[in-house]
Every structure is written in structure tokens, then in C-alpha cells.
Amino acid sequence: MLSDNAFLRYQRQVCLPEIGESGQQKLCDASVLIIGCGGLGNSAALYLAAAGVGKLVLCDDDEVEISNLSRQIAFRNQHVSTPKVDALAQQLRALNPECHIRTVQRRVDRNLLPLEVAMSDVVLDCSDNLETRHLVNQVCFECQIPLISGAAIGWSGQVIAFDFSAPNKATGCYACMVPRDYSDQLGKCSDLGIIGPVVGTIGNLQALLAIQYLAELPEFKTHQLMTFDAKHLDWQKWQLMADPDCEICAAKEANTNNNEGVICPSL
């Protein structure tokens, strides 16, 4: 049951028939893990906190740089040289004191990630490198926790959701879409540049997909890649097909016996 204060704060969402009071309560009871507190993580975290998600866990090992301020909209000049997780947490608490924020100022690895993922209802991958994305994908798959992955560079962005908690979870994963050895073909924002509103658009979509999932909206689409060409304002959608040779989702038993695998804790 929502408190009077919560009802007033979220009444514009509560009045939506797809959300209602029960949907808002699900948001208030939810825990979301956000990996990466750059442009994607900034936008997603702001909207999730504003929407009333009860707990956000922010994970990033980086500090705010002046070059971040053109697109990482939660940060201010005074945050330069401050850990990103601390600066973002400060802004989120000011936005919504009812949202519990926990920070993890370190790079995710095989020791840290399984427990953090297992304690979450959904994971947002807002990281900026393939090594992290593949690790997050593997852990979310093995822990059966939904993953919403976003990426942006130049004038382009993409977002896709994977509901690994569903019975048919072996219908594709991030590794089916982007092989591990693909990293040499990708550029970096520091080299190729990035236009700020693109990361905002993709981060907001990650937040929207998380809200759809947490509120149990039937419109939530899984395994559907959405790509955005900001220069021409063009959207395209692609249905992901599972790779029968995928080292993650096509060989669960093999991964269990692989030293490279992870162990998802029981809570």
C-alpha cells in the first residue's frame, strides 16, 4: 500500500491504467543494479529514481572529468575529480530522498558481480567496454536475472533487453549478437566522439524498459534490438536469433564445468 506521500509524488504514473497503484508499489519494492555511471547510467538512474524505484545500486570505478559534462547530465562543475558513483548518488538523493542508493566504487569482476546481480531484480548495463558487457551478460544469464544493455557512439545508439528469468531464456544473449573477438572492430567515444542527446535517448530507453519489466507490462519486449541513427532520426528494430554455437546460452552445462564460469549465489 502506497503511503500518502508516495501517492502524491507518483500520482501522474499511478493514474496510468497500465501502472496503477499496484504497479507503482512494484517499482517501490524493486532493486536495480546500474553498471556504469557515465552518460547512459546518468540518464537511466535519474529517471528510475524519479519514477520511484526503491533501490538503486551504482557501480563504477571512474571519476568525473570535465569532458564528461557535455553528456553526463547529472554532474556539475564541482563534481570534477569526484568519484562518479558519489556524485550521481548525491544528485539522486536530492531528486528523490525515498530512493535508497548504494554505491560500489570499483570495476566489476567475477568476484563482485554474481552477488550484486543476484540481489537485483533487473540489471542495466551502461558500461563502455565489451569486456564488461560480456561478463555482465554471462552473470545475468547464469543468475537468471533480466539484463537491459545499452550502447552509444558518434551519432548512433542501441538498446536491447534480455529476460533471462523467463522459461525460454535460451533464446539468445549479448554474446550471440556481439562475439567476444569483435572488440578490435569497435571504436571509443574518446576517439570517435559522441553527441550528448544520443546517450540520453538510449539511457532513457533503458529506464523505460526497466519500468516496463518491473511493473509487469505485457508490452515489454525481450530479445529485440533497437538501433537509433540520430543524424537522420531513424529507428530500426531487429529480432535477435540465438546462435546455436554461443559459448554462453547454447552450452549451459559446458559453462558450468568451465573454469571461466561464474557461480551465482543462492539468496
Functional labels for PLM-detected ranges:
Residues 1-267:
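Adenine nucleotide-associated cytosolic modules
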